[in-house]
Amino acid sequence: MVLTLSYVAVDKTSIAYAEEAQKESEQMNKEEKADGAVSVSTPSAILMEASTGQVVYEKNCDERRPPASVTKVMTLLLIFDALKDEKIHLTDEVTVSEYAASMGGSQVFLEPGEVQTVDTLIKCISVASANDACVAMAEYVSGDENAFVEAMNQRAKNLGMKNTHFVNCNGLDTDGHETTARDIALMSRELITKYPKIYEYCNIWMEDITHTTKKGTTTFGLSNTNKLIRHYEYATGLKTGSTGKAKFCISATAKKEDVELIAVIMAAEDSKTRNKDAVTLLNYGFGKCQKYAEKTCKTEKAVPVRRGIEKQVKTKQKNPYIYVDTTGADLSGMKRRVRLKKELDAPVKKGEKAGTAEYYLGDKKIGSVDIVAVQDIREIDMKSVFEDLIQLILL
């Protein structure tokens, strides 16, 4: 027996939301142009530029609050870490445990013993915010949810998420399960910049999955909980959440031309306010931010090496320089000054600092990037001297 669930009700809601969102967006644009300022009604929020991590706007962003399903940003980050390390693969088949299937809240109604691929479960988490799929993946990656949550907290610590403590992998209300708008922005930035493949999942608007169990085969329709990806033209993701304690939260990502932003809203009174405030911040950011970004790492002059088997070492800029301006400055006037060390002492290690590239707007220094050695240079020793003498004699 095959059963297909209908999308009709969702479509009507989406149409109504689209019309309302368009009116709100037009009004917000008028308000922002009027005074250039921005404000949101929700108690905690942050706007971050993704490539640099620069904070463009903040409001009580270090207050600890329950994040609801925005927790799943970290769950997805650990899943993608495991994929990168080849501990798991998208085609792997995951057997759903009785515990995973028992999860309440938003779910895709997985049943004990049901088998789904990693790829499908990522869709269930990203699109439908499925709590049961989260636990199934946590158990598959780490053996059990507790071990997975320990890994979540360690990853948070490594990212500098100073005010975060996870108790579960899906964000269901639990005492002590808290984070902040700033910390959500940090983990969101890590996910989208390190694993842009996440966009392939969180931009799915609707898609069917198939349940195959002892009861038979049924088709279940996934519908994206993040309405912004359909109704805000620059939206790219990322994750919504709502519970009784957390109220309405979102980590909203968007990109316009070369500027990519992360807007985090926590504890909004309803989904309308949550989405409106997210769009307000994103529009504000796109109006304020302009970006200077180098595409390649420039090669610099060689630096002399004292007591090295090579007399000099080649150097290059460690990484391309990126700068985000919010003041309206003329970035075409950006100046670059290179300061190399007079010499390096052997042994020289690849990646060792050999100088600095400094960036100026007018007389103001706005940033710098290290210039590093591109190779190892060993210190000269008697063996090296003897080998050189032999070469000279043979010549």
PLM regions and their residue ranges:
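Domain-terminus/edge residues, biased toward the C-terminal soluble/receptor-binding domains
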Residues: 161-162, 173-178, 182-395
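A generic local structural motif
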Residues: 2-4, 31-33, 249
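Active-site-adjacent loops and short helices of periplasmic peptidoglycan-processing enzymes
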Residues: 12-199
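Sec-dependent N-terminal signal peptides of Gram-positive bacterial secreted proteins and lipoproteins
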Residues: 1-15
